[in-house]
C-alpha cells in the first residue's frame, strides 16, 4: 500500500515534463520595460523599500483590490509574518499549517514566537486536508471563552494558514 507522501510525489511527477530535472517554482517573466525600470531604480538610488516604483505599485494594488491601502513587503515570508502579527499571533500561540508547503509558512509562525502545527495534506489538491483538520480539531482541541485551545498544551490556536500548492488551490470552503 502506498503512503500519502508517495501518492503526492507521484501526482507531482505526473504533471512535470521531466520529473528528474530542476523544476523552477517561481520562474520570472520579463515581457516589457523591466530592464529600463530596474535601471531607473538604480539611477534614483531607491532600490529597496521606498521610492517611486514602490509607491506606484502599492497604489495600483490598492486600486485593483479595492482596498484603501496596500503595503509592499520584501517577500512572502514577510507578508505572512505581518499578517500573523496583525491577527494577534504571539509567543505561546499555535498556528495550523499544511504539511506540504514552502518553509516560509512555518518560519513566519516561528518569527511570531508561536508554534506551527502541521495538518496532513490531501492528494487531490495537495493543500491542507479538510477531513484531517476536522479530525484534529475534534480530538485535540476544545473551545474556551470563544477560543480554540489545544487540549495537551493549553495554548490558543489562533490562526490557520491555507496554502495553494503548485498552482492547485486548496479546498478553502472545506477548510
Protein language model features and the residues they cover:
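Conserved PLP-binding active-site segment in aminotransferase class I/II-type PLP enzymes
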Residues: 1-86, 90, 162
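PLP-dependent aminotransferase-like
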Residues: 85, 89-175
Amino acid at each position: 500500500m502506498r503512503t500519502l507522501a508517495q501518492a503526492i510525489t507521484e501526482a507531482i511527477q505526473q504533471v512535470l515534463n521531466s520529473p528528474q530535472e530542476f523544476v523552477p517554482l517561481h520562474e520570472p517573466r520579463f515581457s516589457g520595460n523591466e530592464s529600463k525600470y530596474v535601471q531607473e531604480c538604480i539611477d534614483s538610488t531607491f532600490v529597496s523599500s521606498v521610492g517611486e516604483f514602490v509607491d506606484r505599485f502599492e497604489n495600483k494594488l490598492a486600486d485593483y483590490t479595492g482596498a484603501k491601502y496596500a503595503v509592499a513587503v520584501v517577500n512572502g515570508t514577510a507578508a505572512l509574518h505581518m499578517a500573523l502579527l496583525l491577527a494577534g499571533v504571539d509567543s505561546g500561540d499555535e498556528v495550523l499549517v499544511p504539511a506540504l508547503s514552502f518553509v516560509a509558512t512555518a518560519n513566519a509562525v516561528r518569527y511570531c514566537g508561536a508554534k506551527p502545527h502541521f495538518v496532513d495534506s490531501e492528494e487531490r489538491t495537495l493543500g491542507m486536508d479538510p477531513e484531517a483538520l476536522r479530525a484534529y480539531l475534534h480530538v485535540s482541541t476544545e473551545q474556551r471563552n470563544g477560543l480554540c485551545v489545544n487540549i495537551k498544551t493549553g495554548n490558543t490556536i489562533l490562526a490557520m494558514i491555507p496554502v495553494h500548492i503548485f498552482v492547485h488551490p486548496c479546498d478553502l470552503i472545506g477548510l
